[in-house]
Amino acid sequence: MGNSRSSALSREVLQELRASTRYTEEELSRWYEGFQRQCPDGRIRCDEFERIYGNFFPNSEPQGYARHVFRSFDTNDDGTLDFREYIIALHLTSSGKTHLKLEWAFSLFDVDRNGEVSKSEVLEIITAIFKMIPEEERLQLPEDENSPQKRADKLWAYFNKGENDKIAEGEFIDGVMKNDAIMRLIQYEPKK
């Protein structure tokens, strides 16, 4: 009775998440219970997020990428994710090639948050992605994609950009929607 914090997910947040994700009320309630157990204060810090993310990629170094993912979803810049931000992150990073996922991908690559992506930002994110690829898979990559620099160069060439050019959000989304090879370059799908 003296506990002022409710352990139940508010109806308002539940309805918002049901409307904006593919998750059912039961799934959201179950995930909320787990989130509350892991994060009793209702927030997850970047280091905790990195640890959890690392569990999905045990044979690689996903911490750098996890940091960028965390930054892209910490919409209020408070250094934590609440349950709503966490579920949106799960939804967008696990769904297919949707417009929303591509908006998120652009925000991931837009490291300095200036509304444009530079080649150095592309290289920074691709380097973080590359560290998630286990060594045995890296050895099987095509010659023109077997290093972060080569992948960044290939991506930049798809967009027909010079070294100092920038990519705007609409151009990024259109390019990825029209070319599956670009999608493959900007993410890592672990082999089953």
From Swiss-Prot:
Residues anchoring lipid (N-myristoyl glycine): G2
Binding site for Ca(2+) 3: N164, K166, E171
Keywords attached to this entry: Calcium, Lipoprotein, Metal-binding, Myristate, Repeat, Sensory transduction, Vision
InterPro entries tied to this protein: EF-hand-dom_pair, EF_Hand_1_Ca_BS, EF_hand_dom, Recoverin
Family indicated by similarity: Belongs to the recoverin family.
Species lineage: Eukaryota, Metazoa, Chordata, Craniata, Vertebrata
Protein name: Visinin
Keyword match Metal-binding: yes
Keyword Repeat: yes
Domain of life: Eukaryota
Annotated positions binding Ca(2+) 2: D110, D112, N114, E116, E121
GO molecular function, one term: calcium ion binding
Signal peptide: none
Gene Ontology biological process: regulation of signal transduction; visual perception
Primary role: Seems to be implicated in the pathway from retinal rod guanylate cyclase to rhodopsin. May be involved in the blocking of the phosphorylation of rhodopsin.
EF-hand domain: residues covered: 24-59, 61-96, 97-132, 146-181
Residues that, per the record, bind Ca(2+) 1: D74, N76, D78, T80, E85
Anything else known: Probably binds two or three calcium ions.
Tissue expression notes: Retinal cell specific protein.
Positions in coiled-coil regions: none
